[in-house]
């Protein structure tokens, strides 16, 4: 028996004033996620998803483009103020924060939340080029 056609649900438009921007800057890519205070994702973007491939993904310009895309997508929720959490040692840390500032957000705080091991896992071996 065929299922009855489900009516499309109306997307509830919520307005959020304060949010958190999580910037994960690794050596290979930069991921920017903008959430509300509870941690529910409003928008996200990556350097790879913004059209950069290979070694160009890990550039500061690619991180800037990813942050601009995530910031513009989150503007439709009425977001005004951002706290920024930066994680990782990648090259796109500062440029992503500057791009969010350029989108018109008022940045209240910038916090470095990079996990630091207390002598945990063994690090990868050093590169010999």
UniProtKB/Swiss-Prot annotation:
Q: Name one GO molecular function term.
A: structural constituent of ribosome
Which lineage?
Bacteria, Pseudomonadati, Pseudomonadota, Gammaproteobacteria, Pseudomonadales
- Protein name, entry field: Small ribosomal subunit protein uS11
Q: Quick one: which gene encodes this? A: rpsK
Q: What does this protein do?
A: Located on the platform of the 30S subunit, it bridges several disparate RNA helices of the 16S rRNA. Forms part of the Shine-Dalgarno cleft in the 70S ribosome.
Q: Which GO terms describe its cellular component?
A: ribonucleoprotein complex; ribosome
Q: Pfam families under this entry? A: Ribosomal_S11
Keywords, comma-separated and alphabetical: Ribonucleoprotein, Ribosomal protein, RNA-binding, rRNA-binding
Family statement drawn from the similarity comment of this UniProt entry: Belongs to the universal ribosomal protein uS11 family.
* PROSITE patterns the record matches: RIBOSOMAL_S11
The answer to whether keyword GTP-binding applies is: no
């Amino acid at each position: 028996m065929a299922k009855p056609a489900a009516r499309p649900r109306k997307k509830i438009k919520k307005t959020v004033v304060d949010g958190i921007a999580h910037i994960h800057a690794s050596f290979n890519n930069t991921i920017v996620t903008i959430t509300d205070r509870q941690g529910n994702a409003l928008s996200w973007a990556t350097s790879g998803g913004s059209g950069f491939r290979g070694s160009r993904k890990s550039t500061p310009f690619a991180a800037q483009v990813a942050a601009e895309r995530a910031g513009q997508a989150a503007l439709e929720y009425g977001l005004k103020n951002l706290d920024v959490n930066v994680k990782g040692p990648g090259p796109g840390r500062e440029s992503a924060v500057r791009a969010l500032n350029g989108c018109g957000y008022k940045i209240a705080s910038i916090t470095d939340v990079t996990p630091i091991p207390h002598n945990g896992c063994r690090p990868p071996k050093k590169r010999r080029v």
